[in-house]
A protein has these predicted regions:
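Domain-level signal for Mg2+-assisted phosphodiester chemistry and nucleotide/NA-binding surfaces
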Residues: 1-101, 149-150
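Nuclease catalytic cores that cleave nucleic-acid phosphodiester bonds
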Residues: 78-203
Length: 203
């Protein structure tokens, strides 16, 4: 069997789904989605999800926290965290200042795991759910140093990358069917009995 690890760029997938107007598909069962991306003769070795905890917006914090707890309760994946970095910006005209947050390190962690797993021979094929062109260099390294390994790019909805199309062995786009069939149950019970419910904004 061909060993496959699926690497999911959380924010690239999230914003692609939102830009497509498909928020009802955000309650994703990621291991189930990863399984649906396999072809006959392939075996899912691991599902790795890369994200960062959002800041500033209470609604987004609540929804993300519920979702991450639901994923952890279901199991079947590992979650790798980057961080949100605070930046102060200033208007050049009126000199007003405000705080913005930008996500850092998620793509670096994904690239690092992708390379580490290749050099440790943990997969035969890597399937990357992302259209982030910054992933081109690690894919180039894998193709150079591990010519028998394959890297496949699965572009989230409303996302594309000329650079990844040029360097990945194969690429395809995630469509509505796979997303709609890979939803978590409406409510998930944690080990302590607490029920995590799908956010109303995602229904």
């Amino acid at each position: 069997m061909e060993r496959v690890i699926v690497y999911i760029d959380g924010f690239n997938l999230y914003f692609g789904i939102c830009d497509k107007g498909w928020r009802r598909y955000l309650w994703l069962d990621l291991p189930a989605l990863a399984t649906r991306l396999l072809t006959p003769g392939q075996q899912l070795v691991a599902t790795k999800y890369f994200t960062a905890r959002v800041r500033a917006d209470p609604g987004k914090i609540r929804r993300q926290s519920t979702y991450l707890q639901a994923l952890e309760a279901r199991g079947g994946l590992t979650i790798h965290y980057g961080r949100y970095q605070e930046r102060t910006k200033q208007c050049h005209s009126c000199h007003a200042a405000w705080t913005e947050y930008e996500e850092k390190m998620s793509d670096v962690r994904l690239a690092s795991e992708l390379l580490r797993d290749a050099y440790s021979d943990r997969y035969d094929s890597a399937l990357i759910v992302s259209a982030d062109a910054d992933l081109q260099p690690p894919i180039e390294m894998i193709r150079l140093d591990h010519p028998l390994k394959r890297v496949v790019a699965a572009f989230p909805p409303a996302r594309d990358s000329y650079h990844l199309r040029g360097i990945a062995h194969e690429y395809f786009r995630l469509g509505r069917a796979r997303l709609s069939k890979s939803q978590l149950p409406p409510a998930i019970k944690k080990a302590d009995g607490f029920l995590l419910r799908r956010p109303v904004e995602w229904q």
